[in-house]
């Protein structure tokens, strides 16, 4: 059974000292939607815009076309092309259960959507249910992006919010520990479930695969700490940033569970 979700738009952090909270952005999304739903986007105005047929546009076109040659078996691509001041950096991170052809399909959708929503912007980011795509004229490899962040949460509340909140944080914290443990195959992604009486709680955490495991843990710990603000007692919720994200529901929401 699906539940409707309302994204709460969070203002981008203009600097580490100030956080401005913008007007809430309301949008209904079906949680159990098997399609690759658009979630949110942000066009960065600080980096300016490029002109049609400019070197920057040429480098961007080269990168996006070249990315389609990838097999997406890792579900992650970070690349750059061109010389300053027209260097373009691009990153694609697909959800942990959406590698291969699903990831490639999400790239195609995200590329066209970002260009439509942020026309000629040198920098921007777009989130879909199954991937994140980011472009920028400056390098951001291995760096936490906490300037781009938003919440999504269920409109329904559980009967015992206090206990549910404790269990939710415990599950997400456990998944974070597993996702960031040292191993030969560091995916920075983990899913799991927890029995809550007659129902189950399902969770997922993920970081961009260019982050060090310690940086990933820092990122996840930070957004999990926002549970009270985003999802207090809600049946489902998500916090998504430009570097990491988590999601929990009271029903399975992934194609596969690790």
UniProtKB/Swiss-Prot annotation:
GO (cellular component) term, any one: extracellular region
Q: Which domain of life is it from?
A: Eukaryota
Transferase keyword on record? no
Tell me where in this chain the Gnk2-homologous domain is found: 38-140, 146-253
One family from Pfam that matches here is Stress-antifung
Chief location category: secreted
Q: Where in the cell is it found?
A: Secreted
Question: Keywords of this protein's UniProt record, alphabetized?
Answer: Repeat, Secreted, Signal
The residues forming the signal peptide are 1-31
Sections of the chain in a coiled coil: none
- Give the record's family classification: Belongs to the cysteine-rich repeat secretory protein family.
This protein is called Putative cysteine-rich repeat secretory protein 61
Q: Which organism is it from?
A: Arabidopsis thaliana
Q: What is the lineage of its organism?
A: Eukaryota, Viridiplantae, Streptophyta, Embryophyta, Tracheophyta
């Amino acid at each position: 059974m699906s539940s409707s979700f309302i994204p709460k738009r969070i203002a981008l952090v203009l600097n580490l000292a100030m956080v401005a909270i913008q007007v809430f952005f309301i949008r209904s999304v079906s949680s159990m939607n098997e399609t690759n739903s658009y979630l949110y986007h942000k066009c960065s105005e600080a980096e300016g815009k490029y002109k049609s047929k400019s070197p920057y546009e040429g480098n961007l076109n080269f990168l996006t076309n070249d990315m389609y040659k990838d097999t997406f078996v890792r579900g992650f691509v970070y690349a750059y092309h061109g010389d300053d001041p027209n260097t373009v950096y691009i990153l694609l991170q697909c959800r942990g259960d959406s590698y291969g052809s699903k990831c490639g399909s999400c790239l195609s959708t995200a590329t066209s959507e970002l260009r439509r929503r942020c026309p000629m912007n040198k920098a921007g980011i777009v989130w879909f249910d199954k991937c994140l795509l980011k472009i920028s004229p400056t390098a951001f490899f291995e760096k936490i992006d906490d300037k781009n962040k938003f919440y999504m949460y269920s409109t329904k509340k559980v009967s015992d919010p206090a206990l549910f909140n404790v269990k939710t944080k415990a599950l997400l914290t456990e998944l974070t520990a597993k996702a960031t443990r040292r191993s030969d195959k560091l995916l920075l992604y983990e899913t799991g479930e927890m029995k809550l009486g007659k129902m189950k709680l399902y969770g997922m955490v993920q970081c961009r695969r260019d982050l060090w495991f310690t940086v990933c843990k820092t990122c996840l710990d930070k957004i999990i700490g926002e549970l009270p603000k985003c999802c207090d007692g809600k049946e489902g919720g998500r916090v998504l940033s430009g570097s990491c994200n988590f999601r929990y529901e009271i029903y399975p929401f992934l194609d596969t569970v690790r």
